[in-house]
Amino acid sequence: LVKTTNRLRSNAPLQGGLIIGNRIPKEYFVTKGTGESEITVHAGSYHLALKSAGIEMANIITYSSILPGIAKKIHKPKEIIHGAVMETIMAVANGHKGELVSAGIINGWLIDRETGHRYGGLVCEHNGNYTLKQLENKLEASLNELYINGFEERYALQNIEMHTSSLTPRKEYGSAIVALCFTSYLYPILA
């Protein structure tokens, strides 16, 4: 490691080494929660929504909305290491006292019409001041738009799941979250 680090610093050409491709999310779970605070959103109601969802101990990173074909849904792990990085596809709605806030995620799998193999998945997130029915309609419309604009000719969209969370805060601030959380990854070795 020291020799490699010294070579990198000197800009000398490296001999050998492992070339790894972009990692691919392999396993995930879905969770949701709500939180309220009299103090603030980010260190208040949002954090308490993460706690309600059971992921408050993690450092959250958000992704865009694609699931690889190898991804598999699992149960939430019993333990998440405090301070671990948790990569998610997340919907978050924040609001004030008396204001309905709703967050949701919808996902479906693209199945190759010719082979029957699972190609990958699409995920859409949405949040706002919606009733659950309004939120569900927006999520369905978003997923349909993604599917129609790039995938419907070759793939069927199947196994659709929707997860929602909503809250009308009684305290000054309120948050609702839904998160698809990745727990493991495949690292392709290229050379």
Tell where the protein language model's regions lie, with residue ranges.
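Helix-coil modules at protein/domain termini and other flexible surface or pore-lining loops
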Residues: 2-191
